[in-house]
C-alpha cells in the first residue's frame, strides 16, 4: 500500500524515465488529481493507448486504466482516431492474460461525468509488486507497463541498478 504522498513523489521520479520511453508520445502528471496520464503508441505504431494511473481509493495501490484508439480509415484527407471498445483480450497488449482486464465506468478526468476505460484489476497488486514502499512505482511500472511494451520492464529495471552502480563509484 502507498500513501498519496509516496505515490505522488514516486511518480514524479518516474516521469523522466517514462518521457524517454520510445513508445511514450505524451506524459503528464496532474498534481491536483494525483494522476499520471500517458499517450502510448503500439509496437507497429498502428494504434494508440491513453493510459491513466491513479491511486486506487480503497486498496491504496496504483490502478492502470487504458483506452484504445485506432485510425479511422473512412477519413483519408487527414488523420482521425476513433476510440474502440473490443474484448479486452483482443487488445494489442503483450501477455494480457497475466492480468484481469475489464471495461468499467470510472470518474472522468474533469467534471462529475463517467467515462468508459479498460481497467486492470488492482486486487493482487501488492502480491505482484511486493509491499515495500521504496521504489514501489518503478517496480509497479516495470511489471504492469509490460502490457504496453514487453521490454519496458527491462528498461525500468536498469534504472534500479544505476543508482547502486553510481554509489559504488563514489
Swiss-Prot record:
Enzyme class of the recorded protein, top EC level: transferase
GO cellular component, as recorded: phagophore assembly site membrane
Record-annotated disulphide pairs: none
Coiled coil, from the record: none
GO MF assignments: Atg12 transferase activity
Major localisation: membrane
Subcellular location per the Swiss-Prot or TrEMBL entry: Preautophagosomal structure membrane
One Pfam family from the record: Autophagy_act_C
Membrane topology type: Peripheral membrane protein
EC number: 2.3.2.-
Active site: 123 (glycyl thioester intermediate)
Entry keywords, A to Z: Autophagy, Membrane, Protein transport, Transferase, Transport, Ubl conjugation pathway
GO biological process, any: protein transport
Binding partners and assembly: Forms homooligomers.
Recorded family membership: Belongs to the ATG10 family.
Biological role: E2-like enzyme required for the cytoplasm to vacuole transport (Cvt), autophagy and nucleophagy. Acts as an E2-like enzyme that catalyzes the conjugation of ATG12 to ATG5. ATG12 conjugation to ATG5 is required for proper localization of ATG8 to the preautophagosomal structure (PAS). Likely serves as an ATG5-recognition molecule.
Full protein name: Ubiquitin-like-conjugating enzyme ATG10
Amino acid at each position: 500500500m502507498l500513501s498519496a504522498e509516496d505515490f505522488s513523489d514516486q511518480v514524479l521520479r518516474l516521469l523522466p524515465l517514462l518521457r524517454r520511453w520510445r513508445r511514450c508520445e505524451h506524459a503528464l502528471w496532474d498534481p491536483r488529481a494525483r494522476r499520471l496520464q500517458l499517450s502510448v503508441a503500439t509496437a507497429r505504431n498502428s494504434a494508440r493507448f491513453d493510459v491513466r494511473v491513479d491511486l486506487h481509493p480503497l486498496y491504496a495501490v496504483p490502478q492502470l486504466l487504458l483506452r484504445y484508439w485506432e485510425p479511422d480509415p473512412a477519413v483519408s484527407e487527414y488523420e482521425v482516431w476513433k476510440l474502440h471498445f473490443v474484448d479486452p483480450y483482443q487488445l494489442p497488449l503483450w501477455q494480457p492474460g497475466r492480468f484481469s482486464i475489464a471495461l468499467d465506468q470510472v470518474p472522468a478526468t474533469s467534471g462529475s461525468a463517467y467515462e468508459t476505460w479498460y481497467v486492470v484489476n488492482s486486487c493482487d497488486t501488492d502480491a505482484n509488486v511486493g509491499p515495500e514502499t521504496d521504489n514501489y512505482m518503478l517496480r509497479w511500472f516495470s511489471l504492469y507497463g509490460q502490457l504496453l511494451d514487453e521490454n519496458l520492464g527491462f528498461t525500468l529495471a536498469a534504472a534500479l541498478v544505476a543508482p547502486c552502480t553510481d554509489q559504488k563509484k563514489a
